[in-house]
Amino acid sequence: MKKKVTTIQKFAWFYAGLFFFVVLLGYIPGLTWNGHLFGIFDIDPYDDLLHLASAIWAVFAAWYSLRYSIFYFKAFGFLYCLDGIVGLIFGNGYLDLAIFLHGIYVADLSTKTALNAPHIFIGGIALYIGFILSKKYK
């Protein structure tokens, strides 16, 4: 018997696709300039591994169960939001090890915002899915 895939699990499948796509973007000719995706986001093997691991984690969560998908969104959302906040303050985040490898990145607030807003936004949506949207499944 085929088990029903919930909306939460569908969101996890979407996140998996999103992160696989982000990894692929870095390898499309014409989208990177001097190692920066769209001329803004520094792309290196650590970023690729982070996004690939995020995608694989989302695939496993979506495939395994609703309960694990909810856990994924709570944990992932917390980690990504915190990474974005750390990046906003210090210029580099911790998930891709940049703060440890390169230290504090001195930049103006608009640059730091452009670099870290995606993690805060994606993490915030994940937190919403994990803590708010998931309530209808309890």
Segments and roles (model prediction):
Residues 1-138:
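Membrane-interface extramembranous regions
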